[in-house]
């Protein structure tokens, strides 16, 4: 899914409280559905099993538009990782967080720097 959304909104994980984001719910449901129906999309799949070896995340620009979203970004990211691992039954699933560049090395906007710092945590 590629869309201009925030971790504080449509991607909001259950452990962050409030309304769980529609994109979070859709992602979890979509992954589970795909795994239950591998043969439908991969006709040569012979049921030998599979392994999910990691999760890539590249997001954060829209959270950098709001001081409130920046303030909770790190907590939301920690909760997102914890909840994805729980919801997919993969307690040790590795995550790779791609940092948001936001204007390159010379970035000076506090909100953007806040998200970048949270992504490094």
Question: Model-derived features: where do they sit?
Answer:
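Cell-envelope and extracellular/periplasmic
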Residues: 1-121
